[in-house]
C-alpha cells in the first residue's frame, strides 16, 4: 500500500527503481498489478484520516483513474489466495501477506520497501 500511496502523493519517498517502474507504467511501457487488498487498505487509512493532506475524495479519484487505466490492472482477491496465504506467516500483517501470496501466484514481483517482506526474500 505504501508504494502506491507514495507514488500518488509523495514520490520523493520512492527509490529510483520504483520511480522508474511507475514512470514506465505512466508512459504505457509497463503494467503494475494493483491487488484489491491494497486498494481496500488505502481506503481504510484515508477514511481514518491517516494520510496528511489526502482526502478520501481525492484518493477515490486517483483509484478510479487507475482502475480505468490499462497500466494499473486491479487484481481480484480470490479465496484461493486467502487460503494459500497461510504459508507466509513470516509476514505478520495480513494485508502484506495477501499481497505477497497474490504476487507469487501470478509470478510477478512485489514492489515494496517493507523490511519483513524483503528479509523473507519475497520482494524486488
What label would you give each PLM region?
Residues 53-60, 68-113:
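Active-site neighborhoods of divalent-metal-dependent phosphate/nucleic-acid chemistry enzymes
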Residues 6-7, 43-45, 82-86:
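A short acidic, helix-capping loop that chelates divalent metal ions and anchors anionic groups
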Residues 121-124:
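Active-site regions of enzymes building and remodeling cell-envelope glycoconjugates
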Residues 34-35, 77:
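Short glycine/serine/threonine-enriched helix-capping/active-site loop
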Residues 3, 38-39, 81, 99, ...:
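Alpha-helix capping/helix-boundary segments
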Residues 2-34, 48-62, 106:
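Short, well-structured N-terminal submotif of metal-dependent ribonuclease cores
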Amino acid at each position: 500500500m505504501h508504494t502506491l500511496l507514495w507514488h500518488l502523493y509523495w514520490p520523493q519517498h520512492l527509490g529510483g527503481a520504483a520511480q522508474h517502474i511507475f514512470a514506465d507504467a505512466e508512459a504505457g511501457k509497463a503494467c503494475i498489478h494493483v491487488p484489491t487488498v491494497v486498494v481496500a487498505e488505502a481506503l481504510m487509512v484515508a477514511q481514518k484520516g491517516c494520510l496528511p493532506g489526502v482526502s478520501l475524495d481525492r484518493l477515490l479519484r486517483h483509484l478510479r483513474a487507475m482502475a480505468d487505466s490499462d497500466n494499473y490492472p486491479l487484481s481480484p482477491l480470490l479465496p484461493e489466495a486467502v487460503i494459500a496465504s497461510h504459508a507466509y506467516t513470516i509476514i505478520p500483517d495480513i494485508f502484506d501477506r495477501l499481497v505477497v501470496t497474490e504476487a507469487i501466484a501470478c509470478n510477478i514481483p512485489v514492489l515494496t520497501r517493507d523490511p519483513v517482506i524483503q528479509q523473507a526474500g519475497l520482494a524486488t
